[in-house]
Structures are given as structure tokens and as C-alpha cells.
């Protein structure tokens, strides 16, 4: 288990998907360009089996904004998209109401 202090270090922010495309080297991954208000980030997400890239453009998502960059199959990811999954289903985590890009999720 993590402590509340450790959890408070995680920076969750609302982002708006500006672009989405299939990862060139991975069947399960999408490469997203996400507006976080003060900057745009590239995020690689394992949601390709559940979402068409075009359906994500313009939608709001919740991302971990202070995660160290990682390279996934040759493409840098500058954050992590949050999603819920159960019994093979997957749903991207979104704010319940429209929020500005970069809004803090608490």
C-alpha cells in the first residue's frame, strides 16, 4: 500500500486529445497528442483494441502529468492515460463535466 503522502505526489490533469493515431510498431497502442493547457504532450496508450483513433480527437481525458517519460516500442510517452477495465471492457477516465485543459484532478 502507498501512503496518502505518496498518492499526493501524483499529478492528475484533464487533457484534450488533439490528435490520435495507431502506433507504427504495436497493434495494441495508440499515440495521442494531448493538450494539458500549458503544453502539449505525446502519450502512448494501450487502448487500440477499444477505441478508434478518430473517436478520441476532441475528447477530454485524465492523465498522469508528472510521470517520467518512457519509450514504448520506439515512441516516447510523456504521461499516462487513465482507463478503467473489467472483464475485457475498457473505458477511458473522463471528467463528468467539461473542464479546461490542464485542470487539476483531486
Residue ranges and their predicted role:
Residues 1-106:
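Phosphate-backbone binding interfaces of nucleic-acid-interacting proteins
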Amino acid at each position: 500500500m502507498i501512503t496518502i503522502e505518496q498518492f499526493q505526489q501524483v499529478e492528475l490533469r484533464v487533457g484534450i486529445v488533439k490528435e490520435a493515431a495507431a502506433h507504427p510498431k504495436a497493434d495494441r497502442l495508440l499515440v495521442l497528442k494531448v493538450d494539458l493547457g500549458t503544453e502539449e504532450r505525446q502519450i502512448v496508450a494501450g487502448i487500440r483494441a477499444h477505441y478508434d483513433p478518430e473517436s478520441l480527437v476532441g475528447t477530454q481525458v485524465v492523465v498522469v502529468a508528472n510521470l517520467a517519460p518512457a519509450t514504448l516500442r520506439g515512441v516516447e510517452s510523456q504521461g499516462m492515460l487513465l482507463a478503467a477495465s473489467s472483464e475485457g471492457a475498457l473505458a477511458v477516465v473522463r471528467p463528468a463535466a467539461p473542464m479546461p485543459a490542464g485542470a487539476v484532478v483531486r
